[in-house]
Amino acid sequence: MSSYGAALRIHTFGESHGSAVGCIIDGLPPRLPLSVEDVQPQLNRRRPGQGPLSTQRREKDRVNILSGVEDGYTLGTPLAMLVWNEDRRPQEYHALATVPRPGHGDFTYHAKYHIHAKSGGGRSSARETLARVAAGAVVEKWLGMHYGTSFTAWVCQVGDVSVPRSLRRKWERQPPTRQDVDRLGVVRVSPDGTTFLDANNRLYDERGEELVEEEDKARRRLLFGVDNPTPGETVIETRCPCPSTAVRMAVKINQTRSLGDSIGGCISGAIVRPPLGLGEPCFDKVEAELAKAMMSLPATKGFEIGQGFASVTLRGSEHNDRFIPFERASCSFSESAASTIKHERDGCSAATLSRERASDGRTTSRHEEEVERGRERIQRDTLHVTGVDQQNGNSEDSVRYTSKSEASITRLSGNAASGGAPVCRIPLGEGVRIRCGSNNAGGTLAGITSGENIFFRVAFKPVSSIGLEQETADFAGEMNQLAVKGRHDPCVLPRAPPLVESMAALVIGDLCLRQRAREGPHPLLVLPQHSGCPSC
């Protein structure tokens, strides 16, 4: 079907070369501030024609909000969004009316429906994912405002080129930000195509090997402008936050494209600060829902969470995530956990706040104004923020408490003004007192979120529509030589992170509403982030 979700339901519609593509979101809470500007950035990251290594289909992908929003706030009614297809060329696919493309859905769609969309694959085209990204952007804003949850995905492998394992393991604990992914993954190519420049201004030859001779580096650096790109220079978005690996990926994709072929790879995804307790035993476990969502994306062929398939080489004593006291786990936090509300009243507890709630679930304490804003006040006198390691692209964004007495768990939820429950802070002495000291499980235990970051990987196969001539049979069983025309990505990976982020947001959003239906006025629990320390 074309719908996903139980409490938060998403429906998408439209074909690749039809008039438009769109989505309907049903179940979204009311009073969420929302505008086109909240959705468009993610669509821009997914948009075709971003560079020479993606499809040259030119689409503006400007989103239109048709219903469900008034005066800048959601109404709680179905929210509909639409994007018009402007660069349609169905005539390029006439030859495919009788010859199904190898690896594509032409044959199976025809077998199922006894008809298939000949132009670009119809619903099986990656164009359909535009609607998912639009829906995911909306849900992502709601989750960010109410729970501080964020989503990041990045390219970790293209063909046999992958991010170093040591860096991958570090990102599992402290993922790169979306800004890091976009900035550090940029690769510039000289007009003659012989020299590559990464985000750290390091130079590479046409094979992706870093230049070491100073004379050669000085000569080739003249090929690039200092402040503005040189005429004829090419900018490639790889969305790999390791600059040196990004260059090798760009070289690999460029080589594949020149052959008229395609190549696949893997996307790593991270859900930072997911609420604790999400997931429904036994068939709607959080990893089962994520796997279903990711495997519903076009071209996906594999999914793993935590250590995944690598866990088969470990013993239980190595793979188990042992629990540790919260004080030891809270020595350092990511920037997403920097915002905290501090109730100045001595001995503030969940029970105390609960007694003060009125029948509508609102808090009647003297901190009501702060709570209702749904914004957590930053305790800048107790925080220390570090930056990003520019050399290897590793995200070092972290916020560390200078006093252990400040370490605590936070209960976060939507505020009353935005259709949710209030926000409160719980001292360490009450509620959850332990957390996982490691995260081999990837943020879930028995299919329920543990409060730790959820990290996973998604494998994408090579694009099936390629320019190389292939010998294949038509629907009548006659052999033909087929070279697919049209505009297609030689590798979908650079445009795939927004897809993965959006599907993850739709899964977590649906599970949050399902858990809230069970919990009633009680806010969901969210743990602050820790990046590990010697004592842990």
Curated annotation (Swiss-Prot):
What InterPro entries is this protein classified in?
Chorismate_synth, Chorismate_synth_AroC_sf, Chorismate_synthase_CS
Write down the EC number: 1.5.1.38, 4.2.3.5
Q: What keywords are annotated for this sequence in UniProt? A: Amino-acid biosynthesis, Aromatic amino acid biosynthesis, Lyase, Oxidoreductase
Question: Which protein family is it in?
Answer: Belongs to the chorismate synthase family.
Which residues carry out catalysis? 17, 104, 489
Q: Entry's SUPFAM superfamilies?
A: Chorismate synthase, AroC
Q: Can you state which reaction this protein catalyses?
A: 5-O-(1-carboxyvinyl)-3-phosphoshikimate = chorismate + phosphate; FMNH2 + NADP(+) = FMN + NADPH + 2 H(+)
BP GO terms, sorted: amino acid biosynthetic process; aromatic amino acid family biosynthetic process; chorismate biosynthetic process
Q: Which GO terms describe its molecular function?
A: chorismate synthase activity; FMN binding
What does this gene product do? Bifunctional chorismate synthase and flavin reductase. Catalyzes the conversion of 5-enolpyruvylshikimate 3-phosphate (EPSP) to form chorismate. Acts also as a flavin reductase (FR) able to generate reduced flavin mononucleotide in the presence of NADPH.
The primary gene name is AROC
Q: Pathway of this protein?
A: Metabolic intermediate biosynthesis; chorismate biosynthesis; chorismate from D-erythrose 4-phosphate and phosphoenolpyruvate: step 7/7
The prosthetic group or cofactor this protein requires is: FMNH2
Q: Where is this region: Disordered?
A: 37-59, 344-377
Q: Which CDD domains match?
A: Chorismate_synthase (cd07304)
> Which Pfam families does UniProt cross-reference here?
Chorismate_synt
The UniProt record lists the keyword Hydrolase: no
Tell me the protein's name.
Chorismate synthase
HAMAP family, from UniProt?
Chorismate_synth
